[in-house]
């Protein structure tokens, strides 16, 4: 329908290839982040409606002794702690959604493209556990990094750098492979 009406030609002629790729990349990242964050926010709001907002008591997992990253912040300022984790989940959601975008330029199979973020997520976990067992390296397993009670101070670099590295690698694949694949 668009080709017959020549509407698509105006779209092609009014935007450059680079701007189109940047818009696709940013849109995919933001949508992936929102897909992860919206259920978390709905859950947070529903919990806040029905559970009293009491300050956490320092016991068990929530000891303020420095064994877990930001546990003092959790005890003292719970909503700031929650906001930081929601932002981190947004960044991870966007990073793994961009993996699917980049893999769509490598594979022609749509089923494989949909599975690539999950394969990457679990693959990082397997590689992280193997390196930890063989060489004693700190874990960069996404499941461990996103669990708020298991994150230690030694993993802060992995916590910050992992989604950035994933996004940069996916962006390079997308911009290099996608530059040859557009009709502009």
Predicted regions, residues:
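Short helix-to-coil transition segments within interhelical loops
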Residues: 11-17
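Transmembrane helix-loop junctions in multipass membrane proteins, especially transporters and channels
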Residues: 44-56, 109, 129, 133-137, ...
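Junction motif at the cytosolic side of a transmembrane helix
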Residues: 102, 164-184
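Central hydrophobic cores of alpha-helical transmembrane segments
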Residues: 111-124
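Extracytoplasmic/secretory soluble proteins
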Residues: 129-150, 165-169
